[in-house]
């Protein structure tokens, strides 16, 4: 769609450097109505000045929607039922937020009769893919405006200069020059000193977690209850999904839990360094797997575990609304019907470790079967035939190799 044909744009607006300038740029370049949408996913004080800032920068209308409960209930929890983790370290805090933002942005576009949507993701990153796959899922004909792929402001310094020229306040200082993205699941950091892959992230970068060295010298034990694979209570106190994750963030943060420094493979093909704080999510995943250990059938667990990397890639690459992710989710949710119980974890100086698990209704652990002291329900001699059958292919292979050497 040509610029002159665009009548109304809904912009995913964070109030940060990129989207603040994009808002002004859209007004100047398209000369049409621009509506900003900001999702409250647990950013805290970051949202306080957004409404005034958006109007001051040229917004015609401003949406700020509290999506915290929906975020955790319908996006984070389903992902954690799958134990999803990308490349062994990343708990997908940014990745899982983008589908919800895209969903609500498209709902607003429909309500407002907008013919275009816009975002602040760069042309080198993952978020452009995540946003736009979501947009096209809800409206295949929507016009997407991605300024980073169109304008000539192709460096952070150029953006800062543009902002100064247009009197746009920006939250970037020499003391905190890196970019960040925060929600209830995590906070991520990129750029600046982190572009040197050998340099350690400075301690003043971290927001959610204490330094493990300065964390309490006494460990804290936390009990988390699960029903159908979802956390429902902490230390016996029932909480909503968003309340529960926020509570675990605070507890985990006090003990320095959930720091990750990762050089990850982006969906567009390049490598990128990110530093993440995911205190509550780290605790939640550890506890969830502990309850699974006592309630989930072995073959079901192994099959599900084999699919974790694929599921995580779908989330990371922006395919949350894809049929393949929905198919996997159905299978995973079926496996979670028996994941009912309580896990006890120990938090101490950056470490989260399971120290106990139990299930009153769905435990598959039977002491009579597992003990090494009794043979009432398990005849140890039966193991001989089991071993011989399972070793058959190995024995045949050895015999054939020996025959070749003769």
From Swiss-Prot:
Keyword 4Fe-4S: no
Short name of any one Pfam family annotated for the protein: Arginosuc_synth
Biological or metabolic pathway of the protein: Amino-acid biosynthesis; L-arginine biosynthesis; L-arginine from L-ornithine and carbamoyl phosphate: step 2/3
Residue numbers binding L-aspartate: 122, 126-127
Residues binding ATP, per UniProt: 12-20, 39, 120
Entry keyword set: Amino-acid biosynthesis, Arginine biosynthesis, ATP-binding, Cytoplasm, Ligase, Nucleotide-binding
Subunit record text: Homotetramer.
PANTHER family cross-referenced by the UniProt entry: ARGININOSUCCINATE SYNTHASE (PTHR11587:SF2)
Protein's name according to its UniProt entry: Argininosuccinate synthase
Species annotation: Geotalea uraniireducens (strain Rf4)
Gene name tied to this protein: argG
């Amino acid at each position: 769609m040509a610029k002159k044909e665009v009548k109304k744009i809904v912009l995913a607006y964070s109030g940060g450097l990129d989207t603040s300038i994009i808002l002004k740029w859209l007004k100047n370049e398209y000369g049409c109505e621009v509506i900003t949408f900001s999702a409250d996913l647990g950013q805290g004080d970051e949202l306080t000045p957004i409404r005034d800032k958006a109007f001051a920068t040229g917004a015609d209308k401003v949406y700020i929607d509290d999506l915290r409960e929906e975020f955790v209930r319908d996006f984070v929890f389903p992902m954690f039922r799958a134990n999803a983790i990308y490349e062994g370290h990343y708990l997908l805090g940014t990745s899982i937020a983008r589908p919800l933002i895209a969903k609500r942005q498209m709902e607003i576009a429909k309500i407002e009769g907008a013919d275009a949507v816009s975002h602040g993701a760069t042309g080198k990153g993952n978020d452009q893919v995540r946003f736009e796959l979501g947009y096209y899922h809800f409206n295949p004909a929507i016009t997407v405006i991605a300024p980073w792929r169109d304008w000539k402001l192709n460096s952070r310094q150029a953006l800062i200069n543009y902002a100064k020229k247009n009197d746009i306040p920006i939250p970037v200082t020499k003391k905190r020059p890196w970019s960040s993205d925060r929600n209830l699941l995590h906070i991520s950091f990129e750029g600046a000193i982190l572009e040197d892959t050998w340099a350690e992230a400075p301690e003043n970068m971290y927001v959610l977690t204490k330094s493990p060295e300065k964390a309490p010298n006494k460990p804290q034990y936390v009990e988390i209850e699960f029903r159908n694979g979802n956390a429902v209570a902490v230390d016996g106190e029932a909480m909503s999904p968003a309340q529960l994750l926020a509570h675990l963030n605070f507890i985990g943060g006090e003990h320095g839990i959930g720091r990750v420094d990762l050089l990850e493979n982006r969906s567009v093909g390049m490598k990128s360094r990110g530093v993440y704080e995911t205190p509550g999510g780290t605790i939640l995943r550890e506890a969830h797997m502990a309850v699974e250990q006592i309630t989930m059938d072995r073959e079901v667990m192994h099959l599900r575990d084999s699919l974790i990397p694929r599921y995580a890639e779908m989330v990371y690459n922006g395919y949350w609304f894809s049929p393949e992710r929905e198919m996997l989710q159905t299978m995973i949710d079926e496996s979670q019907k028996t994941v009912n119980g309580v896990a006890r974890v120990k938090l101490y100086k950056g470490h989260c470790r399971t120290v106990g698990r139990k299930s009153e209704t769905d435990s598959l652990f039977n002491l009579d079967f597992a003990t090494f002291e009794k043979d009432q329900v398990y005849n140890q001699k039966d193991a001989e035939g089991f071993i011989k059958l399972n070793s058959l292919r190995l024995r045949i292979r050895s015999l054939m190799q020996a025959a070749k050497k003769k």
